[in-house]
């Protein structure tokens, strides 16, 4: 259940079509249905977010008490709204600092979550990293396998990407990986469902 942020104005700016209330409702529903290992992803460095916005988000997550939190540093992808419509966002502040990351780490520690994985990728805000935190026994094994590209992913829906990883190693120790992307346009996806 990935809010990205708990600031509604930011969700609106970045084109996310869920609300903070829907995130909270979804989390509570999942808990009531017996889900006992819920991960929540946040993104640091989103437009117009400052340290107080990060604090607000972490306080709301602390109330929900997830089992696992991943703190991502903003990395603007080629097809992301922030890149495609960059002229709209040029004047907006997008900052991720060590202070933001430290604040998140402090809140995670207060919630009994410890870091269990870290990874970096190209173009991350503030030259920071992504860090996964988890309660004892609640680490997101999926997250680690995905970062190490050791897990096959079967994806459904417009714009999704399936990735097949062969478990037999190549002579050089690497693994064969094949990707298959579904068309992004929902109408085309529906019309071509048998091809996907």
Predicted regions and their residues:
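A C-terminal junction/extension of Radical SAM enzymes
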Residues: 79-156
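Glycine-rich beta-alpha junction loops
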Residues: 75, 122, 160
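Short linear sequence motifs
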Residues: 20, 109-112, 182
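Conserved non-cysteine loop/helix-boundary elements of the Radical SAM core domain that shape
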Residues: 1-104
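Anionic group-transfer/hydrolysis microenvironments
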Residues: 4, 43, 119, 157-159
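Alpha-helix termini
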Residues: 47, 54, 58, 125, ...
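Radical SAM enzyme core and accessory elements
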Residues: 132-196
